[in-house]
Amino acid sequence: MQANIKWLDDPEIFRVNQLPAHSDHPFFKNYREWQNNHSSFKQSLNGMWQFKFSKDPQSRPVDFYKKDFNTSSFTTIPVPSEIELNNFAQNQYINTLYPWEGKIFRRPAYALNKSDAEEGSFSEGKDNTVGSYIKHFDLNPELRDHDIHIVFEGAERAMYVWLNGHFIGYAEDSFTPSEFDLTKYIKEKDNILAVEVFKHSTASWLEDQDMFRFSGLFRSVELLAFPETHLVDLDLKPTVCDNYQDGIFNAELKFTGSLNGHVHLSVEDVNGSAILEQDVPLDSEVEFTSSTLENIHLWDNHHPYLYQLLIEVHDENGHLVELIPYQFGFRRIEINQDKVILLNGKCLIINGVNRHEWNAKTGRSITLNDMEKDIDTFKENNINAVRTCHYPNQIPWYYLCDQNGIYMMAENNLESHGTWQKMGQVEPSDNVPGSVPEWREAVIDRARNNYETFKNHTSILFWSLGNESYAGSNIVAMNEFYKEHDSSRLVHYEGVVHRPELKDQISDIESHMYLPPKEVAEYLRNNPQKPFMECEYMHDMGNSDGGMGSYIKLIDEYPQYVGGFIWDFIDQALLVYDPISKQNVLRYGGDFDDRHSDYEFSGDGLMFADRTPKPAMQEVRYYYGLHK
């Protein structure tokens, strides 16, 4: 198969040779590797890569992936990082519009005219910058003689991959891992990995989030080797019984490779005492189910109790070939007959924030240290919940939320604001995904990626279908996907407020943005059909968050009011050296000669971009502290 640049124009082509999404479980060779948190099955490709920036597809080095290509005109770029923050391209912050508005006329394929494929819209677009990446590497000795995959944790926005001159695959969906099989073409030494990243494709219509519009390999890249038998997917289903004291543990495991041997599974409490042990023969699919486990510890914000799961994979001689550790908790979320959301039988209260991934120096390419600082800030200010606005976050964030009892709304990578809201008005004539058949599989794929990757994380209480994408049959299909695959969580989507006739088919929650407290109370007084949530409220721009108490009072008055997520946690601003003041200063949208721009609207966080709290954080600490 050969790569085809026309895939950029086709909403029905969003993955080519990309492996199916699966659980994010770690795996190790033995217990020593686990204890040292180092897997010999992994090889990082982070670091300096050769790089060529092109202003449009026509000027890109088309044959750069070939082994004999002359790369003397290439420079270097660190991976992970944003292309724009390495001074190759223009920084631009936009809220609702698309980056090309006012410059190039585009409409989503098949949206206005069912026969209009919009051919050449992106493959010939003069505004579509391209990053051509090359990485030379040798395979670590520990990875040799194994099947080898490559995982790109995040690439904005469309990516083609070659290895040693051979086309490997194509991927979109910028914020979930893209995994490819390299086994057929990889060598022990002198490998040449080539990656071509386009800033725009049909995926751009689905990724119109309120943020700086970056591109490139902005998350880690790594190689994975697999032992002779490998756990490819883990699906945990810990269930809390009706008495909220006992539980049942179920796990479904899928294996690849040799199936001669056995699997040993154990579950330990925090003291290291086993509460469950089972041993079964290997098979392509294995299921473990416990009898009733009495007096289990429940997981919540106050007591984020996690059990330790250990899965040992043994070959036919009894030798350990793979160890899979995973922590999970028992918790139960449900809506009772009074339309009250209960967690472990008690009324759930969300003291939440919307959180973009952000670092003032590196943009959305953040570190574990950034995440840990944010968790500390949550705890200091009585924040107990987070919405991953408006895309899946880096995998370590989900583990941190599990460990620290942070309730999570796990949102899909979907926002198409600019296709239906124009000049502040609702005008959905060219909305996607809407009910356009050609866009359905792309958004179902995003839902599947989000679900399969993060399905085992106890902290996730809500799946969110996306943000500000209007509503239609494709959003209904996403809702149905989650309902079919996961009965242990609730589904959220705010955009259905614009299509009230679909409310019975979309979202378990009546979700709004910035609805005044009086109107919230009016809904709750009039026989509410669903519990109520503000998925965005208390817009934190400037000297803000006054009147927060009016919302918090609703928690005491109406048990159907679950609370909400403040918009938002941290400013999107960049630390830049100012030659006049000779100081590093924070610059916002519009400060980079970016036009069009939504200017300082990028600065509506409870913290400045350098993670210094704003005065409004005091208000949050006080009011969220009233219902810890």
From Swiss-Prot:
Q: GO CC annotations?
A: beta-galactosidase complex
Q: What is its EC number?
A: 3.2.1.23
Q: Which domain of life is it from?
A: Bacteria
- Give yes or no: UniProt keyword Protein biosynthesis: no
User: In Gene Ontology terms, what is one molecular function of this protein?
Assistant: beta-galactosidase activity
Question: How is this protein organized at the quaternary level?
Answer: Heterodimer of a large (LacL) and a small subunit (LacM).
Entry's family note: Belongs to the glycosyl hydrolase 2 family.
Record's protein name: Beta-galactosidase large subunit
* Provenance organism: Lactobacillus acidophilus (strain ATCC 700396 / NCK56 / N2 / NCFM)
